[in-house]
Amino acid sequence: MAARLLSLYGRCLSAAGAMRGLPAARVRWESSRAVIAPSGVEKKRQREPTMQWQEDPEPEDENVYAKNPDFHGYDSDPVVDVWNMRAVFFFGFSIVLVFGTTFVAYVPDYRMQEWARREAERLVKYREVNGLPIMESNYFDPSKIQLPEDD
């Protein structure tokens, strides 16, 4: 088990060294002794790059902060940038926050919780007035339920 792990780690280290161009000797573990074999990486010759490095023909991006120190990131034109920023903040804060919170505040009875409470109070009053028990074990009247016949 240990020999396998050492062999695996040795291969990983030699591969990492080969990627960096470092000379490495291959180490192979057999039973309790190490055998050093010549590296296969040393025999391989480095390939010359086929394409020469060229500068990017596109000019560098212009610095928009030099042209507009109050750049907000919406447009390179300063006037359009300011108008877009104002529109985003108007709709983001005025419309969404103000009208959104107003809508949430006036949303009718979420999940009908208030209605359920009022309905329960109404049923309790009805049962007390008519002398019925407040709660019954059967939701439906068992005499009205028709069950299928046993075969």
From Swiss-Prot:
Record GO cellular component, one term: mitochondrion
Organelle transit peptide: 1-29
Keywords, alphabetical: Electron transport, Membrane, Mitochondrion, Mitochondrion inner membrane, Respiratory chain, Transit peptide, Transmembrane, Transmembrane helix, Transport
Topology class, membrane: Single-pass membrane protein
Transmembrane portions of the chain: 87-107
Pfam families (alphabetical): ESSS
Localization, UniProt: Mitochondrion inner membrane
Main location: mitochondrion
Family as reported in the entry's similarity comment: Belongs to the complex I NDUFB11 subunit family.
Role played: Accessory subunit of the mitochondrial membrane respiratory chain NADH dehydrogenase (Complex I), that is believed not to be involved in catalysis. Complex I functions in the transfer of electrons from NADH to the respiratory chain. The immediate electron acceptor for the enzyme is believed to be ubiquinone.
Known partners and oligomeric status: Complex I is composed of 45 different subunits. Interacts with BCAP31.
UniProt protein name: NADH dehydrogenase [ubiquinone] 1 beta subcomplex subunit 11, mitochondrial
